[in-house]
C-alpha cells in the first residue's frame, strides 16, 4: 500500500493542483498584469506602468478605507477570540448540562449569508437608533462601525468557539490534574496550563479572524454600503466601487492595482501573525 501511494501520489494530486492553478494562480497572474494596464475589457488592455499604483495610493478614499479596515480588523479579532474562548471554556465544564444545544445555538449564525445578515442587522440597528432619537446608519459613521463589529461578532464567534472547544478538549487531562495537585487555582491553571497548550488553536483562530476582518465585503455592502460619504467603506468594498462604480476608462486599472495592494497587505499581515504566534507554541 505504501509503495503504491509513493508511486501514484502525483496522479492523485493532479486534480487539486489543476483546480488551484485555474482558480487562483492564473487569475492572480493575469490580474497582476492588468494592474499595470488601462482597460475596459481585458482584450483591449494597454500597459501604463505604475501609474495605476500611484493613483491608487494617492486616492483619499482608499486611505480612509485602509484605516477603517485596520481598526475594524484589530478590534473584531480581539473581541471575537476573547468571547469565543470564554464561551468555549464555559461549555467544556463537566458540570454544565446541555452543552450540545448551546454549541448549536452559538454556531447557527455562521450558517447565514453575509448579505442577509447585513440587511437584518441594518433593520435592527436603525430601529434601535430611531427609538433613541439618534441618526440612522446611513448618516452615522459611528453606528455603522459598531454595527459591523456587532454583526461580525454575532456571525463568527460561534465558529471560533467550536475550534477553541476542540483545542481545550485536546489538552491532556493529566496536565489539569497535575496543576490541581500542585495547588494551582482555576485562573492559574487557565493561564499557565491551558493557554500555552492552546497556542496552535489560537494561531488558527487569529489567522481566520484577521483574514476575515480584512476581506469583509458582503456584510459591509448590505449594512452600511460605505455610508455616510464612504466613511464606513472597507477595503474590499472600496475596490469593488472603484472597479464598477466610478466612471472613466482609468478606474478599472486603478481598482486592479488596489486589489493587488490589498492582497499583498493581507498576506503580509497574516504571515507576521503566524510567525509571532507559532513562536509561542508549546512543543508536545
Task: Give the positions of each predicted feature.
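A structural signal for multi-pass alpha-helical bundles of membrane permease subunits
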Residues: 2-284
